[in-house]
Amino acid sequence: GCGEVEVHLGDARNLNFINDESIDLICTHPPYSNIIKYSENIPGDLSHCDIKDFYKEMEKVSSECYRVLKKNKFCAILIGDTRKKGHMVPIGFNIMDIFLKTGFKLKEIVIKEQHNCSSTGYWRNQSIKYNFLLIAHEYLLIFKK
């Protein structure tokens, strides 16, 4: 049969309207730290955080996800990496570490091809010349509680 569906507008850092261990599946694609702006003036918008604050806020998300997810159920997060000032920032791996420290177990990493990526001309040319890949993917991190 069909069950009832409830929709709430909220923030994944505070899911106080959801009971402990009551959710079967969590799927999220959080706003990346200072990469794509999702709003202009929404307080607490993670897309406006610097990287260190973004990680701190994602610790709150991880804790709330762990609290509301039923045992032996799954949490899936789509997240990618970036470059800042010419250096690679492994956001995906750092988020994976945050969720592991919360208590989740990593079940799977799925690599999703990402289109419309930008890269510096030098590295793009080098990648073509030597047949290697640049950041052109995101990670679908699948955790189990």
Regions found by a protein language model. Give the residues of each.
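Class I S-adenosyl-L-methionine-dependent methyltransferase catalytic core
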Residues: 1-145
